Amino acid sequence: MKAVRVHAVGGPEVLRLEEVDRPAPGPGQVLVQIAAAGVNFVDVYQRNGLYPVERPFTLGQEAAGTVTGIGPGVREVKVGDRVAYAGVLGAYAEFATVPADRLVPLPNEVSPKQGAALMLQGMTAQYLACTTYPLKPGDTCLVHAAAGGVGLLLCQIAKLRGARVIGTVSTAAKAELARAAGADEVILYTERDFEEEVRRLTGGAGVQVVYDSVGKTTFAKGLNCLAPRGMMVLFGQASGPVGAFDPLVLMQKGSLFLTRPAVLTYIATRVELLARAGEVLGWVRDGRLRVRIGGEFPLAQAADAHRELEARRTTGKLLLIP
């Protein structure tokens, strides 16, 4: 089978499409024929060495497809089931072995492409809006990269929970996408200072929560956008990691809260995994949440998908199609 492998850390050019043996499922494992795999910043961080992984390895932590084989002791699924998963390396391939307890059943109304697009980013948007800072009517949130994969989903979920949404984007075209996803106000950060705009839009009060996946270039100004006792949720670092930080600043700016969450912590148990994935997939099934596929690439063009993602030229979700 074909798989995208990493032998040395570096830029997108280190990604190599290789012929490898098809894996066999061991005890508690399932063999999944991949229909679509999601492309995420965590893949970039593992490729460039920011998140160390023993090499060589097959990239990718999110996919959807069909069960084609099961190992001893598997009770959760059977051959022929449509499934999706996240948090298991090896998705940039034609087949992958996955622990059965990490699989999520796909409703008939949800396509494999939608399933692959929703696992990491959909569950991320869900835990951000429902658990990390549970949005409620009367809250105002600031969503950076509001036209990105997580951003578009987060805007929609925030509106489902009754919050006011202020989004930041880089272009007018992305602003339209964010508005279509429910953003009440959209700031073009390339033309206006987002901190000043947030203060203006909130009458100087600030927002209850900032959802920041950008990191280095937005973090400090984002703290200034928060109301007293507001929460900075730093869940990514697309522009680079945030530098050394003195917690005393949180007190000085109004007894602020700061968290650096990761989706795998929020789906550590099968109960949580099924609950979060089930809610997200249910919203899609019922037409309450829309998934935007921003681009599809064959495995041989995985490097191009990474270049698009890193250049922030994407809107919605990028997929690899084996």
PLM feature segments, named:
Residues 36, 45, 82-147:
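NAD(P)H dinucleotide-binding glycine-rich loop of Rossmann-like/cofactor-binding domains
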Residues 159-218, 269-273:
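Adenosine-nucleotide cofactor-binding segment
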Residues 169, 217-288, 321-322:
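Glycine-rich phosphate-binding loop and adjacent beta-alpha segment
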